[in-house]
Amino acid sequence: MAQTKWYQLDNAAKIVPSTTGGSDSRVFRITCELKEKVDPEALQSAVTSAAREFPHFSSILKEGMFWYYLDQSDLEAEVTPDNQPALDTIYREGRRNLLYRVNYFGRRINLEMFHVLTDGTGAFEFLKVILAEYCRKRYGLEQLQITVSRAAGSDRQNDAFGKYYKKGKDKSEGQKTAPVRAYHLRGDRDENLQNHLLEGTVSVASFLAAARERNATVAELSTALFIQAALREMSVRDKKYPIVLSVPVNLRNYFPSDTARNFFGVINVVYDAALYEGTLESIIPVVRESFRKQLKQDQVELMMNSYAALEHNIAVKVVPLLIKNLVVSAINAKMQRGITGTISNVGKITVPEEMEPYIQKFSCFMAAPEVQICLCSYKDELVFGVASAFIQQPVIRDFFRDMVDMGIEVVLESNDFDRGTEVRPGAQAGGSAETRPGAQAGGSAETRPGAQAGGSAVTDPAASGDPAGKEAP
């Protein structure tokens, strides 16, 4: 009888099962929008073929006495129509199922993954192989599988944290900071704690020009826009609390690795509302300096080691899993009190040239207890994927309206509404709106600027990233 292969969870994944709950399913979605309607049969064949190159993705999650672990299975993913809530829970205790799903709607292919398996970079590599297989089968492009496989590297299953960990190189006591009480966004939450998605698409060239005009990177400007939108929602009493944005960092940019498992860290950008002078120019320097300080090579190395140190802590090792779960859950709740929201820059997505004629754009979303923005670009399409448990999101409305005020056209689509919204420079509340067909995901339409409430110029409504802008569009 063949012996089943099992994998330890990487250091970023160890806390994931213990911190899953409510709208924070710890599931993320990566979407590829094709230029033609999806062929379900070709997609199923592509997923089956691609899964063979990522054997640890066919694992199921099990509980050990001291840690969770991945147990390789013979299960195969079944491609289905997109007919369930976005970012819905994947892992349920006691259920024997894969930790990812693939579904489709119209021209869109969605890959949803439980964060235990991988981060955004690993998931995009998997999706690229799926797309290569799909194009090979659907359009007869026989060489695509080989091209993408070579780009993915040879050590997809390795734990990069273990490879680069240096004993004793953890954060010193003087460098550790206690979590602060951050400002929290308010709003009506979905009664079923489901995530609401909003996708905003802008021109890479337009957004990059706006960033350069302000001497900022794409990541810095995006973060500053999020902070400014949150500032507008704060009352006078709220301003005693800082805005704290959590920003994932792709550690592969600092430690070479082709791993398809989790390999990311997190930095926090803290902004004191008292510093705000009514302009982005009073926010961007604070964001820039925060990135500069925390993304120095030595600081990133300390951050990476702090993640890996958990596995090497003897006292933690011998604590039973049941107790670990309780402790980790309590610590996570405390840490969440110190976070306003999250913004993650996945960066520029590229595919082999032969595939480009068949792909329109990519987007990504991450389940969130409050609000998370993920951005990625493909060619001249820069997409901001917003996931939130809030039914209405004035902060996100202002986030996109500020882009419009900067002269950037924004096209919005949501899983909550039957239309998208194109927001052009100069749109004003109270004007008329012209709606015309243009259905994409969810049968959305394209709406011209100027609509009043109920059809507003901006509709009220989710990995590892690259905040430094090394792979920015």
Task: Label every model-predicted segment.
Residues K35-A51, E112-K128, L197-V236, I343, ...:
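Acyl activation and transfer enzymes in specialized metabolism, enriched
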Residues I130, Y134-R138, A230, F291, ...:
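Short, well-ordered alpha-helical segments in soluble proteins
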Residues A2-N11, F105-R108, L117-E125, V129-A209, ...:
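Non-catalytic, low-complexity flexible loops and terminal extensions
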Residues F54-G64, Y139, Q143-Y164, A210-L225, ...:
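Short, charge-rich amphipathic segments
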Residues V423-T459:
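Long, intrinsically disordered low-complexity tandem-repeat segments
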Residues V38-E78, A151-Q157, K167, A178-N215, ...:
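Contiguous N-terminal and early-domain "leader" segments and peripheral loops that mark the onset or edge
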Residues M1-W67, D74-R101, L231-V423, G465, ...:
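Acyl-thioester-dependent acyl-group transfer interface
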Residues H196-L198, V202-S206, V244, G265-I267, ...:
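Non-catalytic regulatory/linker segments of enzymes
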